[in-house]
Amino acid sequence: MADTPSVEPTRIDPKLLELLVCPLTKGRLEYDSARQELISRSAKLAYPIRDGIPIMLPEEARPLAE
């Protein structure tokens, strides 16, 4: 039997989260560990985190449902 590696969600350093802002609104971001995204409520966008790296490009962000 092959063991499948367990994938643990990446943790974001709280200090990094304090420094990062939405590139469009310059507002604060919320970390969604379940979806591995940084949420900008003001821009209504969710920026993905890939391999532990936040992708802060608006064209890569997912629009949030109203």
Curated annotation (Swiss-Prot):
Protein name, per record: UPF0434 protein M446_0487
PANTHER family: PROTEIN PREY, MITOCHONDRIAL, ZGC:162634
Pfam name, any one: Trm112p
Annotated family: Belongs to the UPF0434 family.
GO cellular component: cytosol
HAMAP family linked: UPF0434
Matching InterPro entries: Trm112-like
